Amino acid sequence: MKSIDPRHYDVIVSPVVTEKATMASEHNKVVFKVQSGATKPQIKEAVEKLFDVKVKSVNTLVRKGKSKSFRGTFGTQSDVKRAVVTLEEGHRIDVTTGL
C-alpha cells in the first residue's frame, strides 16, 4: 500500500456540494474548498494522491467574504478559496458519499 503524505489532507479542506457544483460534476469536474495558500500544482498532486485519479486541469477562485449584520454588530465572513478540478476521461470522484 502506498503511503499518502499527510500534507495532502491540509490542502483539500472539503468538497463543495452546491447546485452549481453538482451540475459541473456532469462535465467531469469536481469543486473543492482548499487552503488559502494552496497552489494549483499542490492541489493537483493532492487530488491525484488522495482519490487515485488523473487530473486534467485545476482552476482556482477566491470568493470574497460578505459583510453581514449579526445582532446589531457588523462583521465580515472569511474569504474562501475554491478549486474546480477537471478530471481526465474515465475518472470519477463521488463526493456525495463522503471521504
UniProtKB/Swiss-Prot annotation:
Q: Which InterPro entries does UniProt cross-reference here?
A: Nucleotide-bd_a/b_plait_sf (IPR012677), Ribosomal_uL23-like (IPR013025), Ribosomal_uL23/eL15/eS24_sf (IPR012678), Ribosomal_uL23_CS (IPR001014)
* Cellular component annotations (GO), alphabetically ordered: ribonucleoprotein complex; ribosome
Regions crossing the membrane: none
Q: Name one GO molecular function term.
A: structural constituent of ribosome
Q: Give the top-rank taxon of the lineage listed in the UniProt record for this protein.
A: Bacteria
Per UniProt, the keywords (alphabetical) are: Ribonucleoprotein, Ribosomal protein, RNA-binding, rRNA-binding
Instruction: Answer whether the UniProt record assigns the keyword RNA-binding to this protein.
Output: yes
Provide a GO biological process annotation.
translation
NCBIfam families assigned to the protein according to its UniProt record, in alphabetical order: PRK05738.1-3, PRK05738.1-5, PRK05738.2-4
Record note on quaternary structure? Part of the 50S ribosomal subunit. Contacts protein L29, and trigger factor when it is bound to the ribosome.
Q: Which family does it belong to?
A: Belongs to the universal ribosomal protein uL23 family.
Q: What does this protein do?
A: One of the early assembly proteins it binds 23S rRNA. One of the proteins that surrounds the polypeptide exit tunnel on the outside of the ribosome. Forms the main docking site for trigger factor binding to the ribosome.
Please give the name of this protein.
Answer: Large ribosomal subunit protein uL23
Q: Which organism is it from?
A: Rhodopseudomonas palustris (strain HaA2)
Q: Which gene encodes it?
A: rplW
